[in-house]
Regions:
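Assembly/oligomerization interface modules of large self-assembling protein complexes
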Residues: 2-83, 161-164
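Residues immediately flanking
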Residues: 3, 48, 89, 187, ...
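Alpha-helical scaffold segments that mediate packing/assembly in large oligomeric complexes
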Residues: 75, 80-172, 283-289
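Protruding loop/beta-arch "assembly-hinge" segments enriched in small, turn-prone residues
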Residues: 1-35, 252-289
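Short, Φ-rich (hydrophobic/aromatic) sequence segments
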Residues: 14-29, 109-121, 125, 169, ...
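Extended oligomerization regions of viral-like shell subunits
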Residues: 40, 146-258, 263, 269-271
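Short helix/loop capping segments that flank catalytic or ligand/cofactor-binding pockets
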Residues: 54-57, 86, 95-96, 192-195, ...
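Short amphipathic
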Residues: 44, 81-87, 224, 267
């Protein structure tokens, strides 16, 4: 976890690179950062090529013919994630910096409060990264679509009692030119996979895999996130998911809640993502018996 962020002073606003404050967010672990965004509802435009022309062999001194590849542009839409909490001044006074920790225990209460707010930001950011709905047909895209719901993604079939659909999805992505980098799922899905048994009653996934702090299947790291949807697995290709992120903005007010002897703290974070080649990702469904 990132180190606790000190609260700014009266009515002030401070900013910090989001990767320093919330490094565990999925956007930093499972996408490629293409640029930064600031301001009100901005978009980032990332150039890429369509169907790439094949390279050719050319004799020394011979002319090299131009390819017919046309440049395209990926529009990365962004959304702002925010949280506003109000705390009693008694809580704000109990910080290690002011020598007023709880019962002399040395606990930095302000740090604990802001860490809780950062977790709220991470959870919401991860939830929309994975699960944002696709736009309604015929309507323009105003927010990025969650990777599990991304239009054009490979539908990798259903897992019932074998892991074959994962193998097939990896093969399909590779055939399409992608490079699978990991499997994203929630803890319930991972638990279901760990309990799968073959016809002779033996666990399909070795206990050694289950017990390692960094599990992997078929050479791909398993990225566990409680905000991933239930009953689904994403075969991700980090190099094919481009994202844009802004700073974490932290603001404090001691005036608005004056009559309550309280202060307010606000955290905001803007980010978005896009996938130029959706068939470089796959989603697999779990059919639980």
């Amino acid at each position: 976890m990132a180190a606790a962020t000190a609260l700014p002073g009266f009515g002030s606003v401070s900013s910090a690179p989001a990767k320093q404050i919330i490094p565990d967010a999925g956007v930093f672990a499972q996408t490629t950062i293409a640029g930064s965004v600031q301001g009100d509802s901005p978009s980032l435009y990332v150039p890429y090529t369509g169907t790439s022309a094949a390279a050719i062999i050319v004799a020394e001194g011979a002319a090299i013919n131009e390819s017919d590849t046309k440049p395209l542009e990926l529009a990365i839409r962004t959304q702002k994630v925010a949280v506003l909490n109000v705390f009693a001044n008694e809580s704000g006074a109990q910080s290690a910096a002011s020598n007023g920790n709880v019962g002399g225990s040395g606990i930095d209460v302000v740090g604990m409060l802001t860490d809780g707010m950062k977790k709220t930001i991470i959870d919401k950011a991860n939830a929309i990264l994975w699960q944002n709905p696709a736009p309604t047909e015929g309507k323009p895209e105003t927010a990025p679509t969650g990777l599990f719901n991304y239009p054009g993604i490979i539908q990798g079939g259903n897992i019932t009692n074998t892991l074959d659909p994962i193998v097939d999805a990896i093969a399909s992505i590779s055939t399409n030119g992608g490079a699978p980098t990991g499997l994203v799922m929630n803890y319930g899905v991972w638990a279901y996979l760990l309990k799968l048994r073959d016809a002779e009653g033996r666990l399909i996934i070795s206990p050694d895999v289950a017990n390692t702090p960094t599990p992997a299947l078929f050479g791909l790291p398993v990225h566990l996130d409680g905000m991933a949807p239930d009953g689904k697995i994403l075969v991700n290709s980090i190099g094919d998911v481009y994202s844009a992120t802004g700073d974490i903005n932290i603001a404090r007010t001691d005036d608005r809640y004056f009559e309550r002897d309280s202060f307010g703290v606000r955290l905001t974070f803007r980010f978005g993502w896009g996938v130029p080649y959706p068939d470089h990702l796959a989603v697999i469904t779990i059919n639980k018996k």
